[in-house]
Amino acid sequence: NFNHISFCLGNALEVDFPKYNKCVSNLPYTLCEALLWKFSREDFESLVFVVPKKFTGRLTGIVESRLKLLIDAFYELDIFDDVPPEAFDPQPKIMSSIIRLKPKKGNLFLREFFMQYDKKTKNALREILMKSGMTKKEAIKQVSISIPLRIQEKNIVNLSLEEIKEVVRGFIGE
């Protein structure tokens, strides 16, 4: 009896997910990062994925990346086991890993910031500051003195790791 299981067919980046509390998937390796950004906007208990082993290095911070900041803001990460290429048909050319992600409260500033990944940096920051009680005028002024204009004009999704760190330093001093 599989009444409690839903299968979602289609491009995972384009389809609306059905209501769920857990997701298990062998993610398309070329879409892992994009899908983690999409899942950050979803409400769930846990995600269990098979991903490239090298990708787990980006999740844990072994390789410094924007993705590590996303993980820190949204997820508790467990890496369970490595899966050799022979376990698949057809075989990938690389090792894989099984990971579990659970939502966490995380850094509220980073969470709010990343949730608006499709907006310009200055607009997202202005909205965050207005939610914290500033007027629109005060928020615009604070953004203009805290963040260089070249960063303000970029969409969050296009910011480099260094630019994200600069935003964080400008607002929460880390």
Predicted regions and their residues:
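Catalytic cores of RNA-modifying enzymes
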Residues: 1-112, 163-173
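An accessory alpha-helical subdomain
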Residues: 87-90, 94-168
